[in-house]
Amino acid sequence: MRLHLRACFLLLILSLASLPLEARVVRVEIASRTDVLNGKLFGNTGAYERITGRVYFSLPIANVHNQQIVDLDNAVNLKDGEVEFSSDFIAVRPKDAHKGNGSMLLEVPNRGRGRIIGLVDGGDWDLANDAGDAWLLRNGFTIVSLGWQWDAAGPGALRFFAPIAKENGKTITGLLRGDLMLSKEMLEIPLGHFILGDIGGSEYPVAAPDDPRNVLTVRDARDSARTLIARKEWQFAHTVDGKLTPGDRFIHLNGGFLPGMIYEYVYVVADPVVAGGGLAAIRDFASYAKHAADAITPAERVYAEGISQNGRFLRDFLYEGFNADEEGRMALDGVLAHVAGAGRGSFNFRFAQPSRDAQPTSSVFFPTDIFPFTDLPEKDPVSGQTAGLLDRATAEKVVPKIFFSNTSYEYWGRACALISISADGKQDASISDNVRIYHFTGLQHFSGPFPPAKGKADLEGQEPQSPLPIKYFWRAMIANMDAWVRSNTSPPPSAYPKIADATLVPLADYGFPAIPGVNKPHEASRGDRLDFGPNWQEGILSIEPPKVGEPFPVFVPQVDSDGNERDGVRSPEISVPLATYASWNLRDPSIGAPDQRVSFEVSYLPFAKTASDRQRSGDPRRSIAERYSRREDYFTRYTNAVDDLVKQRWILPEDRLAFLHRGEQEWEEATK
């Protein structure tokens, strides 16, 4: 974004002295402060406390490090050259800060929900009754979740509170677009972007319901032609107590919305929120924790963690130059951006839609998978532009240590290959010494249940989901990041598929075996060259839907004869397999569009138990009995695979037994 301003920004950075300002946290309001689990002691760290509240920031508009925030100078609460924002926060910290390890895990919450403690430690995300095995707490980390999304929806969501913008006191209007594919018939849909119920972003209400620029279209796939739905057939309305009532946050369609179709709406909105301040909030809280003598969460080192939407947020944070605080100091020492694929997002635009992602059948053609994709500079052969994610951080000498980690899903669902190849698709791209790229084979966007089961509702696929857990890889990544920043101990080298050894191939060369009854996708997600109007690279989108230019190359990981990926961090389930973990899952016919991929999921396709079973079904993959002479043979190989992961520091020694237990469970499930 804002590529043609990039050179000017870098010149400003290099020519201006740092302004004599502190990290701009101006006050902290505490809503609650309680001992975790009634003062339970966690290893040598001792007791922890959980603090909730709101933190307030003030951003000087003249500071060069704030000038990339869209509409900051138009904020209605601009006073004395500064704009105030605030964020909800949750902090879990050692009661005695001196007993902590000095490192903070700063969680960028996904749509307002902070869940990293539950994911890594296995207990309650809010530590209400159960801390799991308390790995983070036993190891002395401070964990903070900080609101950054202005429209985070649903109860308990951590919010970012930002002013609206006006130009010279006048209301700003514009066009906003949304889309979705339903899994069941509905008479009306909400405006906004919602995932799994009320999780998502509320976005903007319609400002002018009768404006002729408001349009509704339908099509059957991403690249299909749109069909305009006559204006008399729909209205901005909502059913209340059985009565259809005008409403500025719903669309009602006569005859109803059908499943398996992409409905896209464009409508007039007003009063944009200065959403880009959320990027500065993460920056300034990190610097506050490291430099303020009275910080409520003191830290020597800060590692930002983001999953999916918030992983994309961190990629955008780096690209837009937010890792230098207002004094030019490094804000984040480490970044762990997980399952972000090649994406960034709608985080710093006028009328920003931060919840929007880029799924197979929704949030299509949004400013998500947009150039540049690689950390080091790359050239777009079509536009001639040259840029990389780390250009600004490099110019300011604030490049953090970075893990870009992804699963099998992101190569098909998030255009992940673009982070490691040239924009023309001819070769692998070089990566920074401060970057590691990790591809966790066989895993999906979020871990599925065990025993394996199909997704439900909007996520019902044709096959069971991948049940492989990410938890233990997360623990090792956090430990490796801490060692890298703290003592310069190099983490495991990058592990991902490459063009050079044909483990990353064009979609047409993908060699998945012909498994009876298993349908394969005909396409994969891609990065597109989009044009939202003459000022969109300054954050103002005026053409909706955008003009779509030539797509970037589509590459996917190559597979072996079983259909499992050949390169990356290979789970024991991949190197000693009992099943195929296909990198995609198609929508179940019951929810419509069965030729399209379902969001987030990988397919679990078990092997036949015996050779005769395999031969009867026509399955080309060897059966379990043909691979392993008995249970002990399998478990010996599985144990060796686990030990290899421990040796390479992909998992921690203390998690070895948990992996071995899982291997036993998987054998029982596969052979029952």
PLM-predicted stretches and their roles:
Residues 7-18:
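Bacterial N-terminal signal peptides
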Residues 19-23:
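Sec/Tat signal peptide C-region and signal peptidase I cleavage site
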Residues 1-5:
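N-terminal secretory signal peptides that target proteins for export/translocation
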Residues 24-672:
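C-terminal His-loop and adjacent cap/lid subdomain of alpha/beta-hydrolase
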